[in-house]
């Protein structure tokens, strides 16, 4: 083959190769966004069953740490992570399990006022596990948004549906015009590394500082939030909206045991009322041993703050499991005896909530017999509300 013929054959091939290389270079340097991954499972058939939609462009982002959260106490003390429930010093005094659980952001609420037509949130989660077998990602790792209506009542707006550890999504769009107050509840069983609220550029926005004198709940996995469908459906959150008061959630899954080390932090809070709801993690012996010392510990530092003692809920299948029914009977009797003993000592400002109907009496209030579903949380709030109302009235 002559050199002239070789040149004629090779020239088209070289041109094609150059075009391919140029196309590859353009693909690597293009600023066009990558296509979103195709939805899987049922979300292919019903988009409302998929993850939240991504955040829009042209937003102004507001870092929530610049004005603070409700449910985050001891703000003047150093923290290992800004969104931890306890300050760093607690790691040396509480149990390892309580410390690890305290890194979940349950009970924290960010409040703000805006006239935005849409609201977005960008947050990074501490843990990659977004949900649990008996609790959805919306509850474990979601951000749950409420707003005040024209009557000043809190009403639900929307919740994120996370499917990644970093969430940057639109919570709600097409909002009715007007300036209104919002409250966003942080995840129940995950921690938060950072969080910002996004609104369209030009929208009015004001971060609202945390309110004082919260209702303080100390309890177990149920107080922690298991198994609410979303963060605003836990009974401390429900009661906070009903009373329009801030709440501190010190629920520690499997580890709410009336620990004196936790009590040392409780007494540092200028609370409107303390709710002690630890029996689901305790037996009769522990209840007898620890109830009175914890109450005395609180009373020593907070002589006038009401204290509410709560019996544990009954397993919703204890009607057919005699051993569980007997355990609840004995646990309740132990708390009742401790309560009556404290009254005889002259301790004032004590209140008592019975546990038999915390979940109702139809067996439908729990996800797994032990942990509340949304119905169970609403029922707990209904039972607790009148007692808390009386306690709050007495403390004013």
Question: Model-derived features: where do they sit?
Answer:
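Active-site-proximal beta-strand/loop segments in catalytic clefts of secreted hydrolases
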Residues: 218-220, 250-253, 276-281, 310-314, ...
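N-terminal secretory targeting modules
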Residues: 1-6, 12-16, 21-214, 389-396
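Glycine- and acidic-residue-enriched helix-capping/strand-helix junction motifs
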Residues: 131-136, 225-233, 326-329
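Oxyanion-hole/transition-state-stabilizing segment in secreted/luminal serine hydrolases
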Residues: 239, 256-301, 312-319
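Catalytic nucleophile-elbow at a beta strand-turn-alpha helix junction centered on a G-D-S/GDSL motif
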Residues: 212-236
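Catalytic His-Asp segment of secreted/periplasmic serine-dependent ester chemistry enzymes
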Residues: 268, 313-396
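Short helix-loop-beta junction
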Residues: 236-249, 340
């Amino acid at each position: 083959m002559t050199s002239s013929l070789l040149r004629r054959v090779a020239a088209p091939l070289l041109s094609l190769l150059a075009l391919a290389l140029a196309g590859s270079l353009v693909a690597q340097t293009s600023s066009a966004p990558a296509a979103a991954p195709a939805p899987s499972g049922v979300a292919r058939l019903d988009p409302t069953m998929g993850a939240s939609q991504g955040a829009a462009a042209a937003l102004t982002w507001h870092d929530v740490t610049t004005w603070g959260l409700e449910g985050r106490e001891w703000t003047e003390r150093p923290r290992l992570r800004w969104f931890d429930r306890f300050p760093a010093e607690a790691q040396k005094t509480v149990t390892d399990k309580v410390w690890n659980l305290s890194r979940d952001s349950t009970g924290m609420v960010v409040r703000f006022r805006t006239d935005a037509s849409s609201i977005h949130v960008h947050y990074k989660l501490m843990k990659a596990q977004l949900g649990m077998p008996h609790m959805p990602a919306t509850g474990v790792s979601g951000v749950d948004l409420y707003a005040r209506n024209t009557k000043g009542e809190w009403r639900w707006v929307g919740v994120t549906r996370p499917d990644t550890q970093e969430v940057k999504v639109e919570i709600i769009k097409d909002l009715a015009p007007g300036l209104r107050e919002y409250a966003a509840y942080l995840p129940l069983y995950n921690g938060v590394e950072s969080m910002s609220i996004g609104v369209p550029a030009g929208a009015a926005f004001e971060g609202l500082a945390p309110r004082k004198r919260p209702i303080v709940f100390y309890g177990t996995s149920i107080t922690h939030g298991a198994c609410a469908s979303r963060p605003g459906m836990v009974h401390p959150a429900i009661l906070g909206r009903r009373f329009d008061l801030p709440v501190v959630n010190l629920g520690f899954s499997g580890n709410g045991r009336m620990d004196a080390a936790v009590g040392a932090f409780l007494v540092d809070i200028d609370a409107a009322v303390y709710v002690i709801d630890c029996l689901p993690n305790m037996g009769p012996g522990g209840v007898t041993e620890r109830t009175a010392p914890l109450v005395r510990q609180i009373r020593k530092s907070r002589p006038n703050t009401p204290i509410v003692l709560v019996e544990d809920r009954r397993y919703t299948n204890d009607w057919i499991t005699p051993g569980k029914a007997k355990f609840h009977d004995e646990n309740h009797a132990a708390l009742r005896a401790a309560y009556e003993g404290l009254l005889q000592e002259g301790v004032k400002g004590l209140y008592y909530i019975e546990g038999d109907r915390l979940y109702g009496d139809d067996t439908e209030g729990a996800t797994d017999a032990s942990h509340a579903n949304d119905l169970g949380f609403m029922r707990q709030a209904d039972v607790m509300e009148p007692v808390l109302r009386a306690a709050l009235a007495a403390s004013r």
